[in-house]
Amino acid sequence: MAFCISYVGALLPCSLSTRTKFAICHNTSKLHRAAYKTSRWNIPGDVGSTPPPSKLHQALCLNEHSLSCMAELPMDYEGKIKETRHLLHLKGENDPIESLIFVDATLRLGVNHHFQKEIEEILRKSYATMKSPIICEYHTLHEVSLFFRLMRQHGRYVSADVFNNFKGESGRFKEELKRDTRGLVELYEAAQLSFEGERILDEAENFSRQILHGNLAGMEDNLRRSVGNKLRYPFHTSIARFTGRNYDDDLGGMYEWGKTLRELALMDLQVERSVYQEELLQVSKWWNELGLYKKLNLARNRPFEFYTWSMVILADYINLSEQRVELTKSVAFIYLIDDIFDVYGTLDELIIFTEAVNKWDYSATDTLPENMKMCCMTLLDTINGTSQKIYEKHGYNPIDSLKTTWKSLCSAFLVEAKWSASGSLPSANEYLENEKVSSGVYVVLVHLFCLMGLGGTSRGSIELNDTQELMSSIAIIFRLWNDLGSAKNEHQNGKDGSYLNCYKKEHINLTAAQAHEHALELVAIEWKRLNKESFNLNHDSVSSFKQAALNLARMVPLMYSYDHNQRGPVLEEYVKFMLSD
């Protein structure tokens, strides 16, 4: 009698739509797909397949009018940057607290890259005068919380003890704070920067969240919407451009510089849209010329989806166009190889495929089926080409580091295939150790690290090994959220290879809700570790990489906000916002 189990294939972080289950039977050697759900994004240019570049060009509204508008933009654009810089400088000189609010606004609206020098000077002055808990005693909850968050975000240590000033004799936060909505919101935001062991920040998060949730019903509509958005998407753990749309409304007419800053943010968005649209055309052209989706007709043919990852990860650095396009190629191959392991290969073929990647040897693919052989050889060609581009741009060849990530990824996929063939679930710890590799996070971040010119021989350059703990935390966050999203949206029957079911196998009396809560607790722990690792990587050369890596983790709440049709309307809305009017 054949023994069959239902198994969820490697749920890559790139799986923006819900993955389907695969039935693996012991009396066959193939992995059979039940049915891949097509992409349900209702986004211009994404129809679940690859439109030719000319059609994609039309779908993205790149017409003569929009291009002519772009040609006229720079004159006003530069003037608006200068005007904003002047206003920021004035506030930095005359109003320490409002200058911090101004800095926060530039971050939330995604225009801070224009004012790095001015922002650094404001933060330097503020840190010199406010870092002492004694001095913080004379400031409001909102002011101290904002100061704390901005300093930690920018690598300046402030003790969590500054919040002791807001506790009463009972050791609990003071009762009068319950009426300070603005202060509580900022306290909640500040608590997202906590490290492991900072109990007072755990208390601050719980206190502020409970009070704000309890008060939502009695708030006016605009305030309720604003507070609700911040509770759902705290700034530190979310994508700035996504949360910035709501913050634009929050600014209102409170500050005289608000209108100027909003106008600059809109101009910035126009520039970014133009760049992203052009990059998507490049990606579509590359994908069509590659032609692998024609050989692997069951594989996911979603270049738009591939590109979305690079667009969001590098959303803060519009100048890194080449890096976004090149990184998208790596994302595409994670999808393809995942599909090779989930759909095409027998276990014996998957072993040969993995050995070929491990050897990085074209001839080792000779015994593979033609479609698998073509995929493997094209992977080697593409990554060798990426390494050559990095060498030409930055003066060093990272091929060994890049090869290592692909070897590890394929080996992790192979472990999954063997687990599936055995019909048994691994322990929760075994699962998580392997799945954080099969998530694809290491591949993406190592490629990004090298594409940004890090890890070379230049003096003072950070080493790739210095980022391993940071990458590990991001990979675990993704894997756990991926499994949580799958559990919610795929109606798992308890026999699939998710962390939740591996954990429940070891704790047989645990309910699904308790297992879910346990996974969320692990996510919270990894965010604390990620905060600490990010803070410790306080080196000028790595700041852009660090921000991009955090953006990878920040995609999680966008990815797993599914509706009843298993679409991701929140992410869909964000991508539409970034690509079209």
From Swiss-Prot:
Mg(2+) 1 binds at residues 338, 342. GO terms for biological process: circadian rhythm; terpenoid biosynthetic process. Induction: Circadian-regulation with highest levels in early afternoon and lowest levels during the night. Glycans are attached at residues 27, 206, 319, 384, 465, 509. Pathway: Secondary metabolite biosynthesis; terpenoid biosynthesis. Transmembrane segments: none annotated. This is Tricyclene synthase Oc15, chloroplastic. It comes from Antirrhinum majus (Garden snapdragon). The gene is Oc15.
